């Protein structure tokens, strides 16, 4: 987890912070400076069209050609972030890598190029970050905002107020994927356009009612497709930069009349966006019609700006992941006193064995702390196999602030806190798998130590960690006088043997 570590250092202490957005259509880099008030000043913006989503085959494998396009772009970006310390750069990947079955190969190679971890984020986490970027880039309208962001492989919808998002959705429709499906040869016909529009309307049917129930006072569009539409409509004399149904209708007629992406020489549409513009326009028209929008304004802020503000928040002790963990505890009625006891003991043990077991990264501490607090959420489902229920809830929930990998690791930590440690699944994390086994052992020790749930004062113990063993020394005579704890640790020694560790208790 060396790449995943994040120093405990305020963002304003870094000369620069950076956000990389590995999108399905384009890769973007933002370099910025943060001040002590949490404000972010953008110093440099870079973007390259990569069209990663176009490289996905029918089996959802990313082609080597698309992989090389992405890596070549990242090599150029790497020059800008060379030497920047861990924790000052955050790299997020979206729909194309969410979908790619061979994403681990791309991620490994990308991390070698960048020297920083790549996080594949869920659609709803992407939506949360988009809203954060929009909210920090526009004046507060005083009411609810509906934010829409048409990406290369997915489209996100968020309703929020102020800086807080209330509803987040992500749909599998994007300007690159729809181009591949409906406009592959560049020809724009009314029939093809209608197919793309209808497909988007069908996707929207699943979320229309939930969006309408919450309501909004202002509709905002983010990212390149909506920006290009707004600029083209303004250049055509149909408004002052806002998007309206009339403006959309005019632009649609214009695009259909031209009939080919090579002829889309319209002001506001960059040459490298022409091929994907008709698909994006069809999706946007479907959004307007489905939600009966009268107007949409464009925001310059989007995902990468949201990543920067989220990065600043993490360093200023406003980590949204902490709120997510607290929400899980409340939703699933976790006993807060027991969770606190287990967390305190687990972190104390980590401090004692961290050097010997190479568990010194901040992420190790975070995972252990979170795991201790939510390890019992499965009890709200049933006691039988509650560790499996808890792991399932964590793996399959939308956890704001968590990357997919962090979420999977937390799920496995909860799964492994009792009975069998899922060594086969932990091994999927390659070199980090053994460290996750060690984190499981630390958490299991803390839980065993407080098996009696605070009804008895527990003694101080001495710990000694070696590469494949943990020795625990209780005060003389204490174990004999407490046979339940003695039996617990004897059984634990048997479980740990199955993953190649010995537990020596005396």
Swiss-Prot record:
One of its GO terms (cellular component) is plasma membrane. Homodimer. Degradation of inorganic polyphosphates (polyP). Releases orthophosphate processively from the ends of the polyP chain. Coiled coil: none annotated. It is found in: Cell membrane. GO terms for molecular function: exopolyphosphatase activity. Belongs to the GppA/Ppx family. Its cofactor is Mg(2+). SUPFAM superfamilies: Actin-like ATPase domain, HD-domain/PDEase-like. This is Exopolyphosphatase. It is a peripheral membrane protein. Keywords: Cell membrane, Hydrolase, Membrane. InterPro entries: ATPase_NBD, Exopolyphosphatase, GppA/Ppx_hydrolase, Ppx_GppA_C, Ppx_GppA_N, PyroPPase_GppA_Ppx. It catalyses: [phosphate](n) + H2O = [phosphate](n-1) + phosphate + H(+). GO terms for biological process: polyphosphate catabolic process. It is an enzyme of class 3 (hydrolase). It comes from Pseudomonas aeruginosa. Its EC number is 3.6.1.11. The keyword Hydrolase applies.
